[in-house]
Amino acid sequence: MAKEDSIEMQGTILETLPNTMFRVELENGHVVIAHISGKMRKNYIRILTGDKVTVQLTPYDLTKGRIVFRAR
């Protein structure tokens, strides 16, 4: 997937699911399932409930996403 094809949105972690998946509520109120990107996994970035994150969504499936950034 090319970078310009993805949609980036801000969201908040609602709950942690198995296999490093998270339920994220986006700014517009939609709830999506997201997993951690490879660079975040490699650098051991920990994500907890309530964290503000940036999620990349693909235009093909707007119910799944990838967490690419955790706000401090």
Curated annotation (Swiss-Prot):
UniProt keyword annotation of RNA-binding present: yes
Matching Pfam families: eIF-1a
Cellular compartment(s): Cytoplasm
Main localisation: cytoplasm
Alphabetized PROSITE patterns for the sequence: S1_IF1_TYPE (PS50832)
Keywords: Cytoplasm, Initiation factor, Protein biosynthesis, RNA-binding, rRNA-binding
Residue ranges constituting the S1-like domain according to the UniProt record: 1-72
UniProt GO MF annotations: ribosome binding; rRNA binding; translation initiation factor activity
KW Signal (keyword) present: no
Family matches, as InterPro entries: NA-bd_OB-fold, RNA-binding_domain_S1_IF1, S1_domain, TIF_IF1
Subunit field text: Component of the 30S ribosomal translation pre-initiation complex which assembles on the 30S ribosome in the order IF-2 and IF-3, IF-1 and N-formylmethionyl-tRNA(fMet); mRNA recruitment can occur at any time during PIC assembly.
PANTHER family (alphabetical): TRANSLATION INITIATION FACTOR IF-1, CHLOROPLASTIC
Function comment: One of the essential components for the initiation of protein synthesis. Stabilizes the binding of IF-2 and IF-3 on the 30S subunit to which N-formylmethionyl-tRNA(fMet) subsequently binds. Helps modulate mRNA selection, yielding the 30S pre-initiation complex (PIC). Upon addition of the 50S ribosomal subunit IF-1, IF-2 and IF-3 are released leaving the mature 70S translation initiation complex.
Annotated family: Belongs to the IF-1 family.
Protein name as it appears in the record: Translation initiation factor IF-1
Species per Swiss-Prot/TrEMBL record: Shewanella amazonensis (strain ATCC BAA-1098 / SB2B)
Lineage of the organism: Bacteria, Pseudomonadati, Pseudomonadota, Gammaproteobacteria, Alteromonadales
Gene name for this UniProt entry: infA
